[in-house]
């Protein structure tokens, strides 16, 4: 059975838009994916007919909203094969999830003189929180470098690991290069050295199945808006014994069991101890609908379709003169490039005139830009709704820019 691309595209209302008098070719899903009708409708339905404050409400609407929220927690656990829904913490997104781990686990279990390892290809969200921890607590940040082909130089990992390595934080798929890192093997190496491992799944979650138990990672983080869900909602997966040992990062309502001005605070169990205040319940409902959508479409089918589309795109882009591609031969979801000596901003601006949306800049990965000696790159990204015709339009647009501007 062939991939139902026309039906899929019909599910996403914004794809019918025009930009600058041209049909929209949305090639910026790595930044944020479009939303299907089912996600938009589920969030709207919740606010129209089901909304109430969750937790401890005595009335029916509150109890139902709480049950619906916890049902999505169960759904997330199933989606990534967590051992328990109590290993799922709702956060605003990947960035907050990493900051939570850095501030709760990091400030408790990583001591002055210890070290942690990140990689040269990380998004700033998986660099800056660890640098802040290092500055505040005298922790060393070690960096696993890139190899020449755009993959990680994983042979250097055993060199970086030692008895004082407390954590490895690594992206599963690079948001710039599309590199699929061998995280399962890296996790095993790090854990053998006594370190815990955080996997940034912001890019991988939309392109392939994720099984946190098979990976044996300690933490896994992702954002809802990358997987066709709402903005402002994300997930921190953490092994239950680790979450239970970690102190809360933020204080307030919902994360306590008892508060006394005389005897102090008793915190709730995880995951609720990490969910202070009123949650984004509408976003949580939309996230659940997004996971339903991806599951119904079939994650293996998505992976096969996008892999075929990537090969088509890479072959088609060879027709563009003076195009430099960055990253490994085999990549997932994103294609980073520059056209001649032209600034990425200029290339992206011309493509926008043609109705083609890409991302330009440093992609929150300045160390990666420094590695390649460029200030910025263009990035086109694929999703469940991307077509070969859109790739053809990208190629034609780049050829047109080259004719207009030269090298």
UniProtKB/Swiss-Prot annotation:
Gene3D superfamilies: Aspartate Aminotransferase, domain 1 (3.90.1150.10), Type I PLP-dependent aspartate aminotransferase-like (Major domain) (3.40.640.10)
GO CC entries: cytoplasm
Cofactor: pyridoxal 5'-phosphate
Top-rank taxon: Bacteria
Listed GO MF terms: cysteine desulfurase activity; pyridoxal phosphate binding; selenocysteine lyase activity
Family annotation (PROSITE patterns): AA_TRANSFER_CLASS_5
Catalytic activity: (sulfur carrier)-H + L-cysteine = (sulfur carrier)-SH + L-alanine; L-selenocysteine + AH2 = hydrogenselenide + L-alanine + A + H(+)
List of catalytic residues: 364 (cysteine persulfide intermediate)
Cellular compartment(s): Cytoplasm
Pathway stated in the Swiss-Prot or TrEMBL entry: Cofactor biosynthesis; iron-sulfur cluster biosynthesis
Residues recorded as bearing N6-(pyridoxal phosphate)lysine in the entry: 226
Keyword Lyase: yes
A Pfam family that the UniProt record links to this protein: Aminotran_5
Single GO BP term: cysteine metabolic process
The enzyme's E.C. designation: 2.8.1.7, 4.4.1.16
HAMAP family recorded: SufS_aminotrans_5
Stated family: Belongs to the class-V pyridoxal-phosphate-dependent aminotransferase family. Csd subfamily.
NCBIfam families: PRK09295.1 (NF006791), sufS (TIGR01979)
Assembly mode: Homodimer. Interacts with SufE and the SufBCD complex composed of SufB, SufC and SufD. The interaction with SufE is required to mediate the direct transfer of the sulfur atom from the S-sulfanylcysteine.
Role according to the record: Cysteine desulfurases mobilize the sulfur from L-cysteine to yield L-alanine, an essential step in sulfur metabolism for biosynthesis of a variety of sulfur-containing biomolecules. Component of the suf operon, which is activated and required under specific conditions such as oxidative stress and iron limitation. Acts as a potent selenocysteine lyase in vitro, that mobilizes selenium from L-selenocysteine. Selenocysteine lyase activity is however unsure in vivo.
Protein name: Cysteine desulfurase
Species in which this protein is naturally found: Pectobacterium atrosepticum (strain SCRI 1043 / ATCC BAA-672)
Upper lineage: Bacteria, Pseudomonadati, Pseudomonadota, Gammaproteobacteria, Enterobacterales
């Amino acid at each position: 059975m062939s991939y139902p691309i026309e039906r899929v595209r019909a599910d996403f209302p914004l794809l019918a838009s025009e930009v600058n008098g041209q049909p929209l070719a949305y090639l910026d899903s790595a930044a944020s994916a479009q939303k299907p009708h089912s996600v938009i409708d589920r969030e709207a339905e919740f606010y129209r007919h089901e909304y109430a404050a969750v937790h401890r409400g005595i009335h029916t609407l509150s109890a139902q909203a709480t049950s619906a929220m916890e049902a999505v927690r169960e759904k997330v656990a199933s989606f990534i094969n967590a051992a328990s829904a109590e290993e799922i913490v709702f956060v605003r997104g990947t960035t907050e999830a990493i900051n939570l781990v850095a501030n709760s686990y990091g400030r408790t279990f990583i001591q002055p003189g210890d070290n942690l390892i990140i990689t040269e290809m990380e998004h700033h969200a998986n660099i800056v929180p660890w640098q802040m921890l290092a500055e505040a607590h005298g922790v060393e940040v070690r960096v696993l470098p890139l190899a020449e082909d755009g993959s990680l130089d994983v042979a250097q990992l055993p060199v970086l690991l030692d008895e004082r390595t407390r954590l490895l934080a690594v992206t599963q798929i690079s948001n710039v290069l599309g590199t699929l890192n061998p995280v399962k093997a890296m996790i095993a190496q790090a854990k053998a050295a006594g370190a815990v491992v955080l996997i940034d799944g912001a890019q991988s979650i939309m392109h392939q199945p994720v099984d946190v138990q098979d990976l044996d990672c300690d933490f896994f983080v992702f954002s809802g808006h990358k997987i066709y869900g709402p903005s402002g909602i994300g997930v921190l997966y953490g092994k239950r014994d680790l979450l239970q040992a970690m102190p809360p990062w933020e204080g307030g309502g919902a994360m306590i069991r008892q508060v006394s001005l005389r005897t102090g605070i008793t915190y709730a169990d995880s995951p609720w101890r990490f969910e202070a205040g009123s949650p984004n319940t509408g976003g949580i409902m939309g996230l659940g609908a997004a996971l339903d959508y991806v599951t119904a479409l079939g994650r293996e089918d998505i992976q096969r379709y996008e892999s075929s589309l990537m090969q088509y795109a890479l072959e088609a882009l060879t027709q563009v003169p003076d195009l430099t591609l960055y990253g490994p031969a085999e990549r997932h979801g994103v294609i980073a490039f520059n056209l001649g000596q032209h600034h990425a901003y200029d290339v992206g601006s011309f493509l926008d005139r043609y109705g083609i949306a890409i991302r330009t800049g440093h992609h929150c990965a300045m160390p990666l830009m420094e590695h390649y000696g460029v200030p910025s790159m263009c990035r086109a990204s694929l999703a469940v709704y991307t077509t070969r015709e859109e790739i053809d339009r990208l190629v034609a647009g780049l050829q047109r820019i080259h004719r207009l501007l030269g090298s």
